[in-house]
C-alpha cells in the first residue's frame, strides 16, 4: 500500500477529529506507524468488490456511514442488493464524500446509492 499511496496523511480526513488525533506518520510498525495504529488512523471505508470494469461502483468514502438509518456495528459489512448510504453527524454533519472506481468524486453529499457487482453482494471494510 505504501508504494501506491506515498503518504499516510491521505488516509485521514482533516475534518475527522477522532482519527486526526491518531494520524499515522509512517506505514511501518513504529508507535506512530499505520501497522500499529490500524483502523484508528483511517477515516475512509473501502468497497473491496469495486473494480475498474464497473466505474460507477463506490470505491471509498467517509467512515461515518448510516445504512438503513443505522451505524454499522462491525468493520466488515456485506450488503445485498442496492443500498442507500448516508452519513451521521460525526464528521461532515449528515454529509459525506465518496470516490467511485472511475475516479469521479462526490463531495459533501447527503446520500448515494451503492450497487452490487453483477448481483453479488457488496463488501465494505469500515475502520
Task: Name each region found by the language model.
Residues 1-127:
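Short, well-structured segments within or immediately adjacent to enzyme catalytic domains
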Amino acid at each position: 500500500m505504501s508504494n501506491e499511496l506515498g503518504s499516510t496523511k491521505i488516509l485521514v480526513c482533516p475534518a475527522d477529529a477522532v482519527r486526526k488525533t491518531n494520524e499515522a506518520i509512517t506505514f511501518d510498525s513504529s508507535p506512530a506507524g499505520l501497522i500499529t495504529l490500524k483502523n484508528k488512523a483511517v477515516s475512509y471505508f473501502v468497497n473491496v468488490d469495486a473494480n475498474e470494469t464497473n466505474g460507477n461502483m463506490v470505491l471509498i468514502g467517509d467512515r461515518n456511514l448510516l445504512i438503513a438509518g443505522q451505524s454499522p456495528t462491525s468493520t466488515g459489512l456485506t450488503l445485498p442488493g442496492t443500498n442507500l448510504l448516508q452519513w451521521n453527524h460525526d464528521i461532515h454533519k449528515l454529509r459525506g464524500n465518496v470516490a467511485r472506481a472511475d475516479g469521479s468524486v462526490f463531495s459533501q453529499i447527503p446520500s448515494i446509492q451503492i450497487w452490487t457487482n453483477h448481483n453479488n453482494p457488496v463488501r465494505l471494510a469500515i475502520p
